[in-house]
Amino acid sequence: MLYPQEFDVIVVGGGHAGTEAALAAARMGSRTLLLTHNIETLGQMSCNPSIGGIGKGHLVKEVDALGGAMALATDEGGIQFRILNSSKGPAVRATRAQADRILYKAAIRRMLENQPNLWLFQQAVDDLMVEGDRVVGAITQVGIRFRARTVVLTAGTFLDGKIHVGLNNYSAGRAGDPPAVSLSARLKELQLPQGRLKTGTPPRIDGRSIDFSQCEEQPGDGMPGGVNEGTLPVFSFMGSTAMHPRQVPCWITHTNERTHEIIRSGFDRSPMFTGKIEGVGPRYCPSVEDKINRFADKDSHQIFLEPEGLTTHEFYPNGISTSLPFDVQYDLVRSMRGLENAHILRPGYAIEYDYFDPRSLKSNFETRQIQGLFFAGQINGTTGYEEAAAQGLFAGINAALQCRGESAWLPRRDEAYLGVLVNDLITKGVTEPYRMFTSRAEFRLQLREDNADMRLTEAGRRMGLVDDARWDAFSRKRDAVARETERLKSTWVNPRNLPAEESARVLGKSIEHEYNLFDLLRRPDVTYDALTGMDGGKYASTAVSRETLGELSAPVIEQVEIAAKYAGYIDRQKDEVQRAFYYENLQLPQELDYMQVAALSIEVRQKLQKHRPETLGQASRISGVTPAAVSLLLVHLKKGGFRGFTAQQADEVAA
């Protein structure tokens, strides 16, 4: 039957990408339908029970700054929080949380069910409705046809998914869930360029069978013995520690030579080493057999025993993802200290699935071949909940904007890790599952977790993503930061009004001439609290006190202090951004035949002709396109007088 109601946006899949896509489109006012094969698995954490980490936590903060769900759900479900790299600079500090799977999923489900403009429907999608070169809807497994102006596909590992345990394999989207075979076949019919990737998960262990006295305890921040014992982190800009459930520790054990012998003995029955698995696995989350093979010189690897929740005994042994036969899994687990009597609740497995080359997507994640069809998440060759959530949000935003008849939202590489993620995917593609790191961002001093809201919330408000409560909190923070920064810049101290002993205590020596407080705060060893506490607190401001700002007080002071400490570095990076901006925004003529650009090598011509980048900046990031080739292309465009290009260039120069 044809469903009587028509939608603006249909989202296929209810994982981390699908939920953020559906929520974003609905927040923007689009009539949105989320189709999932099982409503009970909305927001399910299919692999590790954690959110965040280096680079990943930055993405979660950006999703949150745009009104997304992941950070708030983590605050509600997080049973251990840690700030990674806390001793390093703010650009690379990252929040990571262990999450209670049940609490996290319940938080996501509640947000979906209470979101205006969003309808949920339980049915697997088998086909797309395509008229000419445009998608017009989706068809479910029982033949229900839903019409829509746009479709966002977030199928995760379900596209022709195949699970491997030893030399045994079977079709599945994940353990216990069926694959999307018909939909995968339909996408192949549309001749979208695709490949195979794989990922894996470890066996789960019953905590009652673990001897924790033989393991090393790893408490989180805010817990006795934690690295930052006095401070319990919060993930969302709208979150609070009051939202957190009870906090619990993780535990650490290690593999040993016996473990490695057991693993090596199973290589002849490993689907990875016998050619049963075609797909490439994630480099930065390798299976334990891959680790033992690649790092043969290491006699031990750290294994983190992570609790799956407060109401279960299940533990996730992070570090032994495997597709080895179950008898090998059983022996390798029991060879480790503290796990000698471990009972395995679920076997580990590898899953192989289809992905589609993200270089065939436009800058807004719309497919080039089919108008109105957007891809997000693991279907684009990424790995990780956080990367999926960020892509889902991005695709949902742009599907809604297309329905409004508005131009796409395309954050730049200097504006957001989301911009880095999108740009990397559409220009470089993937040869292995893509994971975000801070090292992928050229301008990471500007792209910190702490300022994600300062970078993105205003854009989110303009697009309709940010509600009044979030906007009010952001506005108070932004205004307080501006006022306090200005106050410090206009407050002066000199040898006459600042006692020498106070100056020496806080600054290390007495001052000899006049300084404003902001300049003094730029000194590496001077903290905001010490500076404003000089001379009996004479320079403190009640405007940024906890009594005035409540929970916003600490983030405001942090922003002011970072702005002072890193002012010189950030200014230099802004100059680099300006230089990059010139190339980034130069639109390349769509009619340009790269094969006729004689100055370029055949390899470069072929790559440009194949990928057809939209801007000179995108062209510069295609693998094999050298800076010299970019310069030659620029010369060719200037000489050729391509329509719009020379005028556009003149506008840039004038600006």
From Swiss-Prot:
An example GO BP is:
tRNA methylation
Q: Which GO terms describe its molecular function?
A: flavin adenine dinucleotide binding
Task: List keywords of the entry alphabetically.
Answer: Cytoplasm, FAD, Flavoprotein, NAD, tRNA processing
Give GO cellular component annotations, separated by semicolons. Answer: cytosol
> What broad class describes the main subcellular location of this protein?
cytoplasm
- Note the InterPro entries from the entry: FAD/NAD-bd_sf (IPR036188), GIDA_C_N (IPR049312), MnmG (IPR004416), MnmG-rel (IPR002218), MnmG-rel_CS (IPR020595), MnmG_C (IPR026904), MnmG_C_subdom (IPR047001), MnmG_C_subdom_sf (IPR044920)
User: Which residues hold FAD?
Assistant: 13-18
Per the UniProt entry, the disulfide pairs are none
Q: Is Phosphoprotein one of the keywords UniProt gives this record?
A: no
Name the coenzymes or cofactors required: FAD
Q: Where does NAD(+) bind?
A: 281-295
Query: Which Pfam family, just one, is annotated for this protein?
Result: GIDA_C_1st
Subcellular compartments: Cytoplasm
State what this protein does: NAD-binding protein involved in the addition of a carboxymethylaminomethyl (cmnm) group at the wobble position (U34) of certain tRNAs, forming tRNA-cmnm(5)s(2)U34.
Q: Which family does it belong to?
A: Belongs to the MnmG family.
Q: Which HAMAP family match?
A: MnmG_GidA (MF_00129)
What binding partners and quaternary form does the record give?
Homodimer. Heterotetramer of two MnmE and two MnmG subunits.
> What is the designated name of this protein?
tRNA uridine 5-carboxymethylaminomethyl modification enzyme MnmG
Annotated organism of origin = Paracidovorax citrulli (strain AAC00-1)
